Amino acid sequence: MPEGPRKLLDASALLAYLQRELGFEAVREALREGAAISAVNLAEVAGKLKARGKDPERIVRRLLAMGLEVLPFTLEEALEAGALDPLTRPLGLSLGDRACLAAGRVRGLAVLTADRTWAGVYLGVPVEVI
């Protein structure tokens, strides 16, 4: 695997991969090449898995063994996410969405998402809708 992640996964992208939904192949390829997820977005994934009766800890351990990197949510990213609020509020993007976009901007990583709302959105970070 290359040094450091090459793509940043939004919660929706990782969930699409885990559930073999539309676009999961793009996430599988990103995982092979080196992918990361913000701890904020991983919390979203864990919550959804738990709500569906799955064992988030077991699933996350498996993803980590595959090379998924979990990135801490930094002060710089928190401030960036706050700055994105007025720009993304009209689009209905959540705090988790802004956290992902902020992490991508700060770390210089393209973001993969399954959220079609992000199509055509450019806030200083490349977004790939799977």
Spans of features found by a protein language model:
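Alpha-helix capping/helix-boundary segments
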Residues: 13-14, 41, 77, 99-100, ...
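Active-site neighborhoods of divalent-metal-dependent phosphate/nucleic-acid chemistry enzymes
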Residues: 69-112
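Short, well-structured N-terminal submotif of metal-dependent ribonuclease cores
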Residues: 1-37, 49-61
